[in-house]
Amino acid sequence: SKVNDKERAVKLQEALIKLDRKSKQKYFLAPNIKSINDNPFTDGMIPIVKLDFNTVVLKHHKLYKEIKNDEELKKKFILKTCRSDKNLIYAALYKEIHKLQQLFINEFEDIKSEKIIEFSNWLKSNYDPDWDLANLILKGVGIHNGRLHRSITQYQVLLFDDENSGLNSLISTSSLIEGVNTSAKNVIIWSIKSGQGNNNLTSLSYKNIKGRAGRMFKHFVGNVYELVEPKLKNMDDIQLSIEIDNSLIG
C-alpha cells in the first residue's frame, strides 16, 4: 500500500495500467486477502477465489510444550538439527542472534569447503580479521539481518541455496521475509518478537516465516520447529485498500 511503501506502490500501479491497456484477461495472486475495495484495477473482475493448500507437506512441531522455556534444551535441539539439512533460524532480536552466533562458534567444528573458506578469508581481509561473522561462516552458519551490507547478505543467501557450498544454516531477523526468496527444509523459531520495540509478530508475518519451510522440487517435506510459543497479533485476513495515485490517471 502507499502507506507502507509509497514508491513501490506507484511503480506497481504504473505496471498494472500498462497491463490493462494490453491484456483483456488478467488475474492477481496474493496471500491472506479477505476482500478488495472498489478500484479501477479490479473493476469487472470475478470475486476473490480463496485457495487453501500447500504445494509441499508442512509439518509443525510444537516443541515449546516439551522445552518449557528451558534454554539448555533449546540449545541442545538446535545444535543437533543444524548439523544437517538446510535450516532457517528465526531469532528475531539482535541479542538472540549474537547468542546463537557464539553457540555455533563454540560448538561446531570448521567445515572444509573451498567456497566457505574463501568467503571467510575475504571478510577478514576486507572488514576485520576478528569479525565473528567470518568465524561463524567457517562453521557453516550465516547471518541475515538489516545491519549487514546487502552484498554480504545476498552472497550468504547464494551460498545457502547452493546444496554443495557447506553453508547449511542461516540465522535471521524479520529481514528474511522482506524480499528474500529462499527456503529450507527446516524453519526453527528460536524467539518470536518482531524486533520492533519488542512487539510480537503479526500472524501474517509469522505465516510468511513458516512459509519458508519446504519448496516444490527441492524440499518436498518442510518442518517448522517452534521452540517458543507463538503469541501473535491477530491479522489473519486482510481487506486490501488500493489508493490510486492521481498523477497516473489521465
Give the residues covered by each predicted segment.
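Long, largely alpha-helical accessory region at the distal end of helicase-like NTP-driven motors
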Residues: 99-100, 244-250
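Residues immediately C-terminal
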Residues: 2-3, 35, 178, 215
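Conserved segment of the helicase C-terminal RecA-like domain
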Residues: 20-34, 186, 190-195, 199-243
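Conserved C-terminal RecA-like helicase domain
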Residues: 65-69, 74-76, 81-169, 184, ...
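SF2 helicase catalytic motif II
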Residues: 1-26
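A short beta-strand-to-loop transition that corresponds to the Sensor-1 phosphate-sensing loop
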Residues: 1, 29-33, 91-94, 172-176, ...
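Short, structured coil segments at secondary-structure junctions
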Residues: 22, 42-44, 137, 182-183
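Interdomain hinge/linker at the junction between the two RecA-like core domains of SF2 helicases
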Residues: 35-82
